[in-house]
Amino acid sequence: MTVRVEIRETPGDQEAVLALAEAAAEADGVRPLNEQTLLALRYGGPSGARFLLLYDGDELAGFAYLEPSDPPSGELVVHPGFRGRGLGGRLLAAVLDTGGKGVRLWAHGDLPAAARLAAGFGMTRARALWRMRRPLTTPLPAPELPEGVRLRTFEPGRDEEAWLALNARAFADHPEQGSWTLEDLKRRQQEPWFDPAGFFLAERAGTLVGFHWTKVHAQAEGADGPIGEVYVVGVDPEERGTGLGRALTLAGLAHLRSRGLDQVMLYVDEANTAAVRLYESLGFTRWTVDVMYRR
């Protein structure tokens, strides 16, 4: 069979890619593609994004996606039925050649095979993202808002611009989140899971100063049934140290429990020790790890 890598500006056969990803998830116990990649498959990526499809003959054997960040970042996956033949290396070589110097790639689940592949190309571990979880069947402290702050929920058609401005302030040091555009937000508003009743905003004198956006998964790998998610918590830099982040987190957890959920998860950067300490103080424990490799 002839092996080739096609590099495209559009995703191509979305259904074949999703089927490949599902086969990998069943084999590895962890989903290989994150939300950003799945949205790019559905709607198309931003200008400069690249979709790499590895074919063995006419069969799709691997897939990779590169975001045009600085430096580029993305992820790749090889179908379980095509592993052990050097195709992962073939695809990774194409990714590195396409992305250029400093390419960053996520490996979900910290699997040994991914670590070996990365090491073989001189890539080193650059970041670790923890997935943490806690039961919602145990007691939750009541949220205590700072004086002068009130909570309400997100109103579509009214709050988008103010929320984007707050998100940029809150995540000025984390461009993956802080650089969100109106299009990024609207795409998520179109997703079946979006529920403004679970999108909490904190206001002080009419100005947004914090938020907690929750999410509900019908199913997640490793979870027995539906699970809630602390999707994003953000606090204005001027409000840090006031306890607002803790109060927002607790308000969202209470909402998820009111939905009948008995477990909740979140993602947090291993290096964000303040956030890790907060979540551990609220009963979260480490569940799985995603690793970013960089050359």
Curated annotation (Swiss-Prot):
Its EC number is 2.3.1.189. Acetyl-CoA 1 binds at residues 76-78. It catalyses: 1D-myo-inositol 2-(L-cysteinylamino)-2-deoxy-alpha-D-glucopyranoside + acetyl-CoA = mycothiol + CoA + H(+). CDD domains: NAT_SF. GO terms for biological process: mycothiol biosynthetic process. Residues 5-141, 149-295 form the N-acetyltransferase domain. Belongs to the acetyltransferase family. MshD subfamily. This is Mycothiol acetyltransferase. It comes from Thermobispora bispora (strain ATCC 19993 / DSM 43833 / CBS 139.67 / JCM 10125 / KCTC 9307 / NBRC 14880 / R51). The gene is mshD.
